[in-house]
UniProtKB/Swiss-Prot annotation:
Per UniProt, location of the Glycyl lysine isopeptide (Lys-Gly) (interchain with G-Cter in ubiquitin) cross-link in this chain: 223
Root EC class: isomerase
Record's protein name: Triosephosphate isomerase
GO molecular function, one term: triose-phosphate isomerase activity
Subunit structure comment from the entry: Homodimer.
Species of origin: Saccharomyces cerevisiae (strain ATCC 204508 / S288c) (Baker's yeast)
Gene: TPI1
Modified residues (Phosphothreonine): 4
Positions with a binding annotation for substrate: 10, 12
Active site residues per record: 95 (electrophile), 165 (proton acceptor)
Length: 248
């Protein structure tokens, strides 16, 4: 079964009503293939607004984070039910910025993933190594450790999309070569096949998330295990449409 091309746009802590309106209107008027799934993830403040603007069936809205409780005294957090209530369908979990700046460890991310899936949203699960880990030859050790934590909690990965984001490439302008990305993605899929079975692993989408942009996205076109992109800064710019159309 062919895996549907998936492009996530992580706006991070960027955007205003005006800029988000411009981004969504650009998507609404762009020529986008029917066989692509696009998820834009604005700051939580603008989730409701973004949902109201989207007109393309290929485009849905996701959150950048969610807590692992449905409600309660958790100041500053957003629950999965609240995200769903405003029409968002996905949530990004495990992003390297959450791991490093907010000290979210593998177990916490695994628990959040299990909870979010149980509440009925899709999860874009981020994994990846730092520059130090890459230099030490530990890339696969790191991503397998991160995946193992989630595998202990989640048995059905139907609504999970994995995003491999080499931390050393995020926001630096550096990017893994398409060949390197393919090798790592293939290794991730092989590892997941050993845990979930060949069928589940073959259906799972694995995104590349390291400084993908309108210029380099097309170079990944023929890489069998690169099923799309999780885009950061470029998702705020017109080139986001070029990334979405990079498989045409």
């Amino acid at each position: 079964m062919a895996r549907t091309f998936f492009v996530g746009g992580n706006f991070k802590l960027n955007g205003s009503k005006q800029s988000i309106k411009e981004i969504v209107e650009r998507l609404n008027t762009a020529s986008i293939p029917e066989n692509v799934e696009v998820v834009i993830c604005p700051p939580a403040t603008y989730l409701d607004y973004s949902v109201s603007l989207v007109k393309k069936p290929q485009v849905t809205v996701g959150a950048q984070n969610a807590y692992l409780k449905a409600s309660g005294a958790f100041t500053g957090e957003n629950s999965v039910d609240q995200i769903k209530d405003v029409g968002a369908k996905w949530v990004i979990l495990g992003h390297s910025e959450r791991r490093s700046y907010f000290h979210e460890d593998d177990k916490f991310i695994a628990d959040k993933t299990k909870f979010a899936l149980g509440q009925g949203v899709g999860v874009i699960l981020c994994i990846g190594e730092t520059l130090e880990e890459k230099k030490a030859g530990k890339t696969l050790d790191v991503v397998e450790r991160q995946l193992n934590a989630v595998l202990e909690e989640v048995k059905d990965w139907t609504n999970v999309v994995v995003a491999y984001e080499p931390v050393w490439a995020i926001g630096t302008g550096l990017a893994a070569t398409p060949e390197d990305a393919q090798d790592i993605h293939a290794s991730i899929r092989k590892f997941l096949a050993s845990k979930l079975g060949d069928k589940a692993a073959s259906e799972l989408r694995i995104l590349y998330g390291g400084s993908a942009n309108g210029s380099n996205a097309v170079t990944f076109k023929d890489k069998a295990d690169v099923d799309g992109f999780l885009v950061g800064g470029a998702s705020l710019k017109p080139e986001f449409v070029d990334i979405i159309n990079s498989r045409n």
